[in-house]
Amino acid sequence: LPVAKPVLIEQLMAGIEDSQRVEISGIVRAFRPRGVVIIFEIASGGYRRDVNVPPPAGIDPQTLIGAKVRIRGTAATFFSGKLRHLITVTLHVPRAEDFVIEKMESGDPFAERVIPLDSLAQYRSEHEIGQRVHVKGIVTYQRPGEDLFLQDATGGMQLKSHLLKAVAPGDVVEAVGFPNFEQFLPVLQDAVFRKVPESPQRPTTKTVNLSELQGGFRHADLITIQGKVLDSVERWFTLPGGGKPGRRTILTLQSSDSLFSVEGPATGTDAGRISVPI
């Protein structure tokens, strides 16, 4: 095989290395088996890319989450048919030895100290970039296979997680994941969580007005807000990665001179004909 050309992830994502043998580095964020290969999701420079790799001999892929790796493979760039817009870039690794583990995650992240939820967006000199953090809180809401919301004494946090196991509001859980920002708001990505053997606790709600929400000050908090129901529809949804489909109720409400939407489990009632506080 030809010598792999070291490239930045930005070069790869620009599509200019299509069909070339290249070398990139990054952090393993997730994986999923597919046929005779394992698809690793690699994060680098704010991008995430799929890398198709023959199963590493004698290594449990789960232990590679958080590891820094160096990868050599062929870049495959996918474009839309007529407009030739770049859709995605995948790296195909022909040999297991082209998937080089440079540094494993330093220990069990669940053994690290628990950090307050409001500190995820703050500077922490002891935190190594690209490594997972350990949090703990009370469950306020969950969409299994999609996300989970936690609350502690400092505030709330959204955790993105593909786990389908269900937890209930009030359950106390601990989680580890990669801190990041989405739409300029802090979030814990690729989170793994587990229940803590503690008695369920009642989450604290905050009474707010619509202007606070419009200012972005209550992201991931459990809140109470009042509004007049103007419309109600039910929509089908399917869990990410499969699973049994279900229904959700979408309410359109009015508060003062503004409209906003509320999403929740299907109620089976004609909520569109009544005005209720929520």
Describe each PLM feature range:
Residues 1-278:
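OB-fold single-stranded nucleic acid-binding module
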